[in-house]
Amino acid sequence: MNETIKVIKNRRSIRKYKAEQIGDTEIHAIMEAAMYAPSAMNQQKWHFTVVQNPKMLDKMADTIRKNLLKSSIDLFVERAKNPDYNVFFNAPTVVLITADEKAHFTEFDCGAATENIALAAESLNIGSCVIGMAGFLFESEKADEIKKELGIPEGYKFIISVALGYKDVKNPPVPPKNKDVINYVR
């Protein structure tokens, strides 16, 4: 099997990480892969904030948990009631992906970059988990203050995040795939 397809098929959402931080060479390679993602009209209106500071990661997770408690979605509230709940699964690295609020198609561009991050990580035997609930970090009156503290450019909005770390668990088995989702017009 082709190596690229093998990596795609092996990648899983990992939710248990070793405490050891990802090496600089590896995180730089992963982030370079993100920048090689396609973007509409090659506009590249994305920004990647790589958070590895343990105190900042704890602060982010705690803020998200508190904001989830105010959610109208019962499942989110139930998870957040657990004081040990960490939306990032205690990963030692989290990438926040943001994009220019005025640019077009950035959700798609950032989605492609997110997949590149996940696939590059898997190719290096590093676990990843794409996490949308990190958006609750910016669901408070302190959103602008948090963005500034994280170095997120003004006028950029949260799109998605990716937790990264050395796997402390084997990849889960492949879940069944719905095969009735493709039609060919020839």
Residue ranges and their predicted role:
Residues M1-R186:
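Acidic, surface-exposed loops and disordered segments
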